[in-house]
């Protein structure tokens, strides 16, 4: 089996990504739930391709260790969104919903793949989509940031 290039000393850099376009979508389902012992297993890869028309889920955590390869337990569920402009999403990308910054992508969980991917976002305080006032049709933007987590 091929080695995961981000998990060892295969690449000559810790940051192979130098520029990318935003990934943009629209909220299609709002969530209102929390979990204290969820056990999300974030994959080692810090990048995923998001295809136009696919549905993905946004979940938030305040756990400081949340990063590629980590296990995340304390979460709040935000929303599902449909990708309108596809591209690459990276750990460290800033997530905005309805023009408001939510937090940075911590990593990705594939529990429900191939149905959808769980995008785990690091925030100061985990609140559900309903608690944040997320609305159907809100624009979701995942934007590259120069300062990576």
Role assignments for model-derived ranges:
Residues 111-123:
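Short, solvent-exposed secondary-structure boundary/capping segments
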Residues 1-69, 97:
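N-terminal intrinsically disordered, low-complexity, charge/repeat-rich segments that act as generic
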Residues 93, 99-100, 138:
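Structural motif
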Residues 98-99, 144:
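Conserved "cap/hinge" positions at secondary-structure junctions
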Residues 88-90, 95, 134:
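Short, well-ordered loop/turn sites that connect or cap secondary structure elements
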Residues 61-78, 116-118:
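Short, basic/aromatic beta-hairpin or loop at an interaction surface
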Residues 101-111:
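Short beta-strand-centered aromatic/proline hotspots
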Residues 78-85:
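Short alpha-helix capping/helix-loop boundary micro-motifs
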């Amino acid at each position: 089996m091929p080695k995961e290039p981000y998990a060892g000393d295969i690449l000559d850099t810790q940051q192979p990504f130098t520029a990318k376009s935003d990934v943009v979508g629209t909220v299609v389902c709002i969530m209102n739930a929390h979990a204290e012992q969820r056990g999300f297993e974030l994959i080692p890869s810090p990048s995923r391709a998001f295809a136009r028309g696919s549905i993905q889920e946004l979940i938030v955590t305040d756990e400081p260790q949340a990063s590629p390869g980590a296990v995340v337990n304390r979460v709040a569920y935000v929303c599902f969104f449909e990708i309108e402009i596809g591209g690459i999403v990276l750990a460290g990308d800033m997530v905005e919903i309805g023009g408001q910054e939510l937090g940075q992508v911590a990593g990705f969980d594939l529990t429900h793949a191939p149905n959808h991917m769980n995008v785990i976002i690091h925030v100061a305080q985990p609140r559900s989509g309903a608690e944040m006032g997320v609305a159907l049709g809100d624009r979701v933007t995942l934007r590259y940031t120069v300062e990576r987590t």
